[in-house]
Regions:
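Glycine-enriched, solvent-exposed interface loops adjoining structured elements
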Residues: 4-176
Length: 176
């Protein structure tokens, strides 16, 4: 059995033009780049690759029920919260993912009496994946009553195939 050698940016754009039987005057690089980006994101979503699994450790701010997800996050796989405020070892719990409306109904306030160790999380805020301030946010409930250590397990968005990044893991191993 032979292994496909994969694509470079140049060979893939040529293959797209050959398949559609049009040249670069009709099928511009802007259009083919969007095809490529959409395909890469679909592959990453449907066939998670171990090399792109990451973890981020941090601490909650007492009374603050939202945190930024890490830069270039494609999706969050899970969130652990530790009993400790200084270590990501020992007793911990996995937060249960819920809809934002569930969390708002579960604990409608961040007042001191409503705080505790978070049990639930929800995603919100839309995401472009470029930086930690625009990669979406996590909403937790209840709001933390101390600076618990957390660990976010997530799938990252690798640099995509482009004229300046001519090969990627996906272009080499997901050729057809």
């Amino acid at each position: 059995a032979s292994i496909m050698s994969g694509f470079t940016y140049a060979t893939l754009t040529t293959a797209i033009q050959d398949y559609t039987e049009v040249d670069s005057n009709v099928l511009t690089s802007t259009i083919t780049n969007q095809f490529i980006e959409n395909a890469e994101l679909r592959i990453l979503r449907d066939a998670p690759i171990d090399a792109y699994k990451k973890q981020k450790i941090g601490n909650f701010v007492t009374g603050q029920d939202t945190i930024n997800v890490p830069a270039k996050t494609l999706f969050v796989k899970g969130v652990q919260v530790y009993d400790s405020t200084s270590a990501s070892t020992g007793n911990n719990r996995w937060l249960e993912k819920k809809d934002e409306s569930y969390l708002q109904e579960y604990v409608p306030s961040t007042e001191t009496a409503a705080r505790g160790q978070p049990k639930y999380y929800a995603m919100f805020g839309g995401a472009t994946g470029v930086s930690d301030t625009d990669s979406g946010r996590l909403f937790v409930a209840p709001a933390p009553d101390t600076t618990y250590t957390f660990k976010i397990h997530y799938e990252t968005i690798p640099d995509g195939l482009s004229s300046s990044n001519t090969t990627t893991y996906i272009s080499q191993y997901f050729g057809n």
